[in-house]
Every structure is written in structure tokens, then in C-alpha cells.
Amino acid sequence: MSHRLLLFTLLLLSGIFSSHTLASGSRAEKKVEWKKTDLHQGYALLYGIAEKQKSVDMLLIVKNASTPTAALIKEISRTYGELHGYLKPLAINGQLVAKSSNGLPLAETSSRDRIQRIKTEQLLSRSGAFFDLTLLSTQVEALTYSSALLSHIAEQDPSSANKENALAYQQKLDGLLKKIWQQIEKLQKAG
């Protein structure tokens, strides 16, 4: 499979070209008011992602990535480690956020666990540029989701300090996302 076809496939899989976006262009989002439990669950979801992502660099112990990809993965891991440390003691209006209560139904959490196992198997079975592209595509998904979640959290959290922190982490993740796309482009040109 050519690198160009692989890149296009990765873009499709990561949701960059959804059929809705291709058909209708971008749309303005509707602003929805969250309940107090929604904000707590949003933080719990973010905490769960940070919990997993802070260790993504452990994959580099058993798999070899190119030097630029490995450096980027380590930076992603460090950033999620910082986010995890910030979220761990987080409270809203004096109430500690329950990190295990993300509000997702069992069908969703079971499906997410299965997807994670499948992606791990895929990563372990790949090597070279194909491994780099596959690994980077998983990070596109995680960073895009986390960034969107942080944006919504910043809109809804009544604490100005929490809003500022959410927006600061969103900027960091968006910066990492930009670096990932640059690395994917370099890999595609090299292939």
C-alpha cells in the first residue's frame, strides 16, 4: 500500500473527513448548558484519558519509532502526565471530582476497552514508517477528543481558575496535534 493511500486511510479513520463535513462543510456548534453532574463526568472522562495517555511512551520500550516520532510521543506523555497531576486533586465548588464516575454506559466502556485492545495489537504488529503512522493516528484521536473536551469544560466550569487551566491545556494539546500532523506529512513525503 502506498504511503499516500495509507495517509488518506488514516485521515478517514481518525474522523478528519467525516461524510457530514464533506457534504455540508463546517457547522457552528450549538451551545448546550451542562448540569453539574455533566461537568464532573467531563472531568472524569478527561482524567481517564490522561491516565492512559501519560504512559503512551511505554510502548517505545518494546517498539522502535523514528527519532522525531519517539520525541513527539514522549512530549505527549509528559503533557498528559502534567494534566493528570492537575486533575487528580481537582474540586468543583469545594467538591472533589469523582474520577471513576464518567457517566458512560457499560456498552460504551466495554466497546472502548475492546477498541483499545485492537489498537494495541495493531501497533504491536507494525514496524517502520507504518508503525509511526499508526501510532501517530492513535494520538490524533486522543488529542482531538481531549482538546474538544477541554473546550467544553472551559465553557461550563464556574471557576475562572479551572477555565484558565482547561484552556491552557487545550492550547498545549492543540500544539501537539499540529506537530503530529507535521510529522505525518514528513513521513508521507519520505515514503
Residue ranges and their predicted role:
Residues 8-16:
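Bacterial N-terminal signal peptides
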